A protein has these predicted regions:
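Bacterial N-terminal signal peptides
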Residues: 8-19
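N-terminal periplasmic/intermembrane-space "pro-region" immediately following the signal or transit peptide
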Residues: 21-240, 249-255, 652-653
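Short loop/turn motifs that connect adjacent beta-strands in outer-membrane beta-barrel proteins
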Residues: 120-123, 146-149, 170-176, 252-256, ...
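Carboxylate/His-rich catalytic cores and anion/metal-binding grooves
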Residues: 251-292, 406-408
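Outer-membrane beta-barrel transmembrane domain signature of Gram-negative proteins
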Residues: 281-319, 342-346, 423-429, 433-458
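Outer-membrane beta-barrel "beta-signal"
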Residues: 401, 604, 615, 632-653
Length: 653
């Protein structure tokens, strides 16, 4: 392949050189003998000789011209002879076996050319405007190296996927895609070296924001049972009344090292849940937790809830880049799934866990395997869960592999295991390895012993740009199953989120429609009383961190869906309408629950660096075991975010 590429390059070079010589006029022939210099002994001045018309007379070498020689002559103009134009040289944008070298735009900067990148960078938070922009480019048929189901992305991996698609975007007739590309590259400008100089130190405030959220009416804040009025919000506190948060984030990058801190002050007023005793009794029976409870529990919002005024680290981690991996420690976002409204395995519905992460941030080609499955990315993390009482202090680890066999299709396998806990099994290297590698069914005596491999949840997902309409329609599926090797092996027992996105409505190209349906209540006898998906018999608070489901907000034994209609004003501005519906099974929550939400959202920029995000939501919900009749609440939110430019310097020579 390399020899063929070298021969192709040499042939192109020879062709270009021969064409250049063919278009260069021939020089006049040199005289056979130069006349002697007048200063030499016996030399005489040269005598001019007549020349044919249409040629240039020769000038004597080093001779002193006489006045007669200095008289101007007017030769006839020379008419250039047209040279035949060679065939155009077309180099493909992507390597092929016939042409292994990809094309670059004219005068391409160095950073566009592929090469080894040893520098590290911080992750972009999953609630950033960057992800809707990247997703829109992906669903328009660009960003062939984007892994939709594995978020977040680092700043540099985002830059690489954008540069890999730059020529396709720039040479397309899609002006909206070009605008999105320009805004994203401006966001990442600190990562882009100038000329041949590598990026040096990058530091500064990444964002600063304040949010005012007023809620009028009774709310739901019970992720593990009845439902949530506010979801996918990092498990932040909220109650009826005025809720306020203000925060900032900082980024520091130098060579392979990076540091990111995002902290915020949060305020939520006091509230009262007042779950009736019959409801608490039934929920505790289904959860297999003794009632009355020994003390406050995060999964049961009961009694008077005090006002909350914490300062909390939303994200905080240090990382080092090693051979295409980010190895990090701390609190980092995770959104493992292709869905827009939720992710079955991991989302930002709950507070992030403190964990050790190993993330392959750049696609990896594995010999032989990648010929069949395409480039692969993988992610692993392990950390401790908080807010658990039965059992206290369990740990969790997650492993994911995602493949792209074609530019239109991505699929992934993921596995989460919750193991250990006070009084059950110690968290040691031995118990970790046992939980990591064990895929066998677990008998009751083993489950309740120190050899318990843990609660195992397996996920399978894919995204597919549909044939013939790949620039318009994207199909996604995300599934999870409890105690199965993979949802593919037991599809009837799995929970699903599936949907379709229409990126451009015919006649209104900036209008986008997205619909997703979700269920955690499969039609099997095992799904009863909430004791299946997101639940576990040993770690009884199940798939939660500080009381909130870590996966999809739909929760346990429920069905629902979401729909979004979005009009894109620009690359980072939009108007969006959303509808949400959820129904919880009656055998889990007595009488069941029903939620309907209608939401209008506007994201607008003032200048380049100030973003306004304002939205209004109406919710009507029914939970007869909690409150009789239809309950209504309205939420109005205004958030201002400032995105200052990071300071950056070139690397030292």
């Amino acid at each position: 392949m390399r020899i063929r590429g070298s021969l192709s390059f040499a042939a192109l070079t020879l062709y270009a050189v021969s064409t250049a010589f063919g278009q260069t006029p021939a020089s006049p022939s040199a005289p056979a003998q130069a006349p002697p210099h007048p200063a030499s002994p016996g030399a005489t001045a040269p005598v001019p000789t007549p020349t044919p018309a249409g040629t240039i007379p020769e000038a004597p070498a080093y001779g002193v011209q006489s006045p007669s020689q200095q008289q101007p002559q007017t030769p006839a103009p020379v008419v250039p002879t047209p040279q035949p134009k060679g065939p155009p040289v077309t180099v493909p944008e992507k390597p092929t076996s016939e042409a292994p070298f990809a094309a670059y735009p004219s005068y391409a900067p160095v950073e566009q050319k592929p090469g080894f990148d040893w520098m590290g960078s911080t992750y972009i938070p999953v609630d950033s405007w960057v992800y809707p922009a990247l997703t829109r480019l992906y669903e328009m048929g660009f960003l062939d190296t984007m892994y939709l189901g594995m978020r977040p992305y680092t700043r540099r991996s985002t830059m690489h996927m954008l540069l890999a698609s730059k020529s396709t975007i720039v040479n397309s007739d899609n002006e909206e895609a070009q605008e999105i590309f320009a805004k994203l590259m401006n966001e990442l400008s600190a990562e882009i070296p100038s000329g041949n100089v590598d990026r040096g130190l990058v530091y500064g405030m990444d964002s600063s924001y304040t949010r005012f959220m007023g809620i009028g009416g009774p709310i739901l804040r019970d992720s593990f049972h009845l439902g949530q009025t506010i979801s996918n919000d990092y498990g932040r506190p909220y109650q009826s009344g005025l809720n306020v948060l203000t925060g900032a984030s900082t980024t520091e990058e130098w060579g392979p090292f990076s540091l990111y801190v995002r902290g915020e002050y949060q305020h939520a007023p006091s509230g009262t849940a007042n779950y009736p005793v019959p409801l608490l009794t039934q929920l505790s029976v289904n959860d297999e937790i003794p009632f009355p409870f020994a003390g406050p529990m995060d999964i049961y919002p009961i009694g008077t809830i005090a006002a909350q005024n914490p300062f909390r680290l939303v994200e905080a981690y240090a990382s080092v880049h090693v051979l295409g991996h980010e190895i990090s420690g701390g609190k980092i976002d995770s959104w493992l799934g292709p869905g827009f409204g939720g992710a079955m395995a991991w989302s930002n519905n709950a507070e992030n866990v403190y964990a050790l992460h190993v993330d392959r941030v750049e696609p990896l080609n594995i010999k032989y395997l990648s010929k069949l499955l395409g480039p692969v990315r993988y992610d692993f993390f392990v950390g401790s869960l908080k807010g658990h009482t039965y059992l206290n202090s369990p740990w969790v680890h997650s492993t994911m592999f995602s493949f792209r066999p074609t530019r239109d299709f991505e699929f992934a396998f993921q596995r989460t295991v919750i193991w250990g806990g006070e009084g059950h099994a110690p968290v040691t290297l031995h118990t970790f390895l046992h939980s990591f590698f064990d895929t066998n069914d677990t008998a009751a005596d083993e489950k309740l012993s120190r050899n318990d491999p843990g609660a195992r949840f397996s996920d399978f997902s894919f995204s597919y740009l549909l044939p013939f309409v790949r620039k318009y329609a994207t199909l996604i599926l995300d599934s999870i199953s409890h105690d199965d090797v993979t949802p593919i092996s037991a599809p009837r027992r799995a929970a699903y989120r599936t949907g379709v996105a229409i990126s451009q409505i015919p006649g209104i190209p900036k209008l986008e429609l997205r619909v997703e349906a979700v269920t955690t209540d499969p039609g099997v006898a095992r799904s009863f009383a909430g004791q299946f998906n997101y639940w576990e018999i040993v770690q009884k608070e199940g798939y939660t961190n500080k009381g909130f489901i870590m996966g999809d907000w739909i929760g346990r034994e429920a069905k629902g869906g979401q729909a979004w209609l979005t009009y894109h004003l620009s690359g980072n501005e939009w108007i969006q309408l959303e509808y949400l519906n959820k129904k919880t099974a009656k055998d889990f929550v007595p009488g069941g629950t029903t939620q309907n939400q209608f939401k209008a959202d506007v994201v607008k920029r003032f200048g380049k660096d100030v973003e306004l995000n304002a939205w209004v939501q109406y919710e009507g919900w029914k939970a007869p075991a909690y409150k009789t009749g239809l309950q209504k609440n309205t939420t109005a939110t205004v958030q201002l975010t400032w995105y200052p430019k990071l300071h950056h310097y070139p690397a030292l020579p």
